[in-house]
Amino acid sequence: GGTSDYLTAESYTPEDMIRAMDQAGVDMAVGCSLGQMVDNSFIAETMALHPTRIVGFGQVNPRNVDATETIDNLAQKLGLKGLKLHPTMHGYHFADHGLLDPIFDAAQRNKLVVLVNALDDPFCAPLSVEEISRSFPDVPVLIAHMGTVWNVNEAILVARRNPQIYLETSGSQLLDVKLAYRSLGASQIVMGTDWPGSDFDLERAKIARAIPDAGDRALVEGANLQRLLGIQG
């Protein structure tokens, strides 16, 4: 089994991902489905096969009538540790309390971290993420891609006034990470790769250039997410 890179339609397997991790010196990483082909069972099977290497995040379309039941299932039966939301792919505006409040309520009762795919489009502007997140301060939220390209400053602003909101760095520019680090410090930044869209070693190099302090870099490269997910060790 495996998943496809949405840019190339080439297939990649979990073993390919682990090899890329090994080459870059990465111990553990999050894996999840693409928005185009949600397969929570496959992610759970992958995590079960590689429990010390891959942490599985599930995915759901909030517009589905069984969305909250799906979240309960992916957390309680499949054992996944987080929830990815893709407003652009699934066609909803994030600042919709009627749609998103039940999703965040389900994430809260299942103690899931929420990852929001948030490039710079009107479906998922950081201020919209904040609108929902501020009603659920106990649910950690990762703004994926930091709102790249045009919403980075807004993402930094939102994270600065909401301690439960974190910025995930995949797809962002080096300067963006520097700006976030200067404004927030290291405690609300989480390194991501969007593999296979990028490579683990390239993303680590970006973080090393943006965050020269070794202790702060350790937080961004793993310790922050380790704490949010309750991973021991």
Please state what every model-predicted region is.
Residues 28, 36-115, 119:
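Active-site gating/metal-coordination segments in enzymes
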Residues 1-28, 186-188, 201-233:
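Mid-to-C-terminal alpha-helical segments outside catalytic/metal-binding sites
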Residues 9-16, 35-39, 63-66, 99, ...:
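Soluble or luminal CAZymes and related metallo-dependent hydrolases
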Residues 23-24, 49-53, 77, 109, ...:
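Alpha-helix C-cap/termination motif
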Residues 7, 34-35, 119-122, 146-148, ...:
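Short coil/turn segments
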Residues 16-20, 39-46, 70-74, 99-103, ...:
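A general structural detector for well-ordered alpha-helical segments in enzyme core domains, enriched
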Residues 81-82, 94-190:
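Catalytic pocket-lining loop regions of alpha/beta-barrel enzymes
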Residues 21, 43, 74, 83, ...:
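Conserved, mostly hydrophobic/aromatic
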